[in-house]
Amino acid sequence: MEINNIIYSNPKQAVLPMLIQDYLDICDPVLTFDRFMGEIELEKYLKNIPQHDTGRLRYDPVSMLKTVLFGFMANGYISLRELEDQCKVNLRFMYLMDHQAPSYRTFGYFINEVLADSIEEIFQDINKKIFETEHVDLQHLYIDGSKFEANANKYSWVWKKATEKSRYRLFGKITTLFEEINEELLCTGMKLCINSEYAPEYLKEAAEQYAEVWQINEAMFVHGRGHRKTTQQRHYEKLKEYAAKLEEYVEKIKICGEDRNSYSKTDHSATFMRIKTDYMGNDQLLPAYNVQVGVADEYIAVVDVNQYRSDMDCFIPLMNKFYTTYGFYPKYPVADVGYGSYNNYIFCEQQGMEKYMKFPMLKKETTDKKYHEDPFRAVNFPIGEDGIMRCPNGKNFNLQYRKNVKGNKYGRQEEVYQCEDCSGCPYAEQCKKTDKNRTVRINRELTAMHQEVIENLESIQGALLRMNRSIQAEGTFGIMKNDRWYKRIVRRGIKSVLLEVFLVSIGHNLYKYHNKQKKVAAAA
């Protein structure tokens, strides 16, 4: 008889210590993170978790919160499946989760359902604790924006203007159809109202009335080759078709809203923008979000996600968000050329902020001496004692009218002046481009603001602030994209994208805080 001896043994014996933290260095980022988070009351963000009396015990929500935040601190951006894997193999994540390994679905539910409503409060409280510890100066705020490509198909655009044109063409088709139906219904006494525009509800009502008059039964309709549709069937089907198409156009225009001209079919919150990183090589517009940050002492003090293509429209919402968080406006908001506009300068004056935002022609004004001193520029025309502006040829420029500037919120007006007579002028080729008398537009208030901005930025303090902005604000996006590999939005929908950006910003600030604490410890 054959005897099989099976030896049940484990050559690897358990060893001491059993505590994970004994394997970690005292300056390990997870220990710095855990000590810092221990000073914040995390339970208040987790009060809305639904309670269940049956089923398995839930994971500790405080540990889940710490694990998620540390994942974004350590990786820059971390996916749900990476979180699950790290909890199984990484000592740091094991330490935070106490050897438990939730599934990616559990992490997804926790982030989307539990953190979604409290993530901004978490961001603010973590920031306030860091700023209090590090004595961060919030009076100097360095602002920058970057367009992040959305998680949407590249050729899924819907253009608002194209939709509006299609809708007006459809209005014409509806009018033609109504005229045909009215001729058909002369004997019945029924008549459809003809307008320049129509609502989908009116077309549905008209289809119901038309079906009632002719006793139309859709089950008796014929389709396909060899069948001839009756006039009533054709008219009824067109009414239904036009109503559905009109409803589609109304929905598309509603999704676009008043502030943007496009959206993506796969992510309605994404707007098509021109992105600097043109990896397609054809200057193609791509669905994206405009992410704005305000940086103070290398920390992200305020962050916002916008659907505007221009940075100019993002400045005021960002400053209002800063005020809501900290209770005051920064004294020195420093921004690049994309933020300098009349609206933003007036807003700074109203809120007691200095003007340190460049305007579009600043570089040409300050570096191109020929352009700055050009005698044929309207701002360089001399004004006599009688208050009349004159050109280099001595001709008077008379005020024609004042007009409101499009898109202005504060009633900005331009003064339009015209030369009294340009005929026979020896400087005509240098001064004007048409055969008519030269017309110029002047906004003296904006010109004075530009001069103030130039003086601010050309001062010693202005030069230091400009240098710091390029280091801190642009450097923040450089770290995000190139060091921590967060180059594209993962989630869809403005609310989910804002949640994602807050998590990335919290991770960035905790990462900065750990590095600074490590330098202090090394210096000591």
PLM region descriptions:
Residues 7, 68, 76-89, 100-524:
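Anion-binding and metal-coordination hotspots
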Residues 1-5, 51-55, 461-464:
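A ubiquitous short alpha-helical element
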Residues 26-66, 72:
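Basic, short loop/linker segments at the boundary and entry of helix-turn-helix/winged-helix-like folds
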Residues 22, 55-60, 72-76, 96, ...:
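Short secondary-structure transition/capping motifs
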Residues 19, 63-69, 106:
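A general alpha-helix detector
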Residues 1-31:
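Hydrophobic alpha-helical membrane-insertion signals
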Residues 41-43, 53, 87-97, 104-106:
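Helical catalytic core of nucleic-acid polymerases
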Residues 16-24, 47, 460, 464:
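Short, charged, low-complexity loops and linkers
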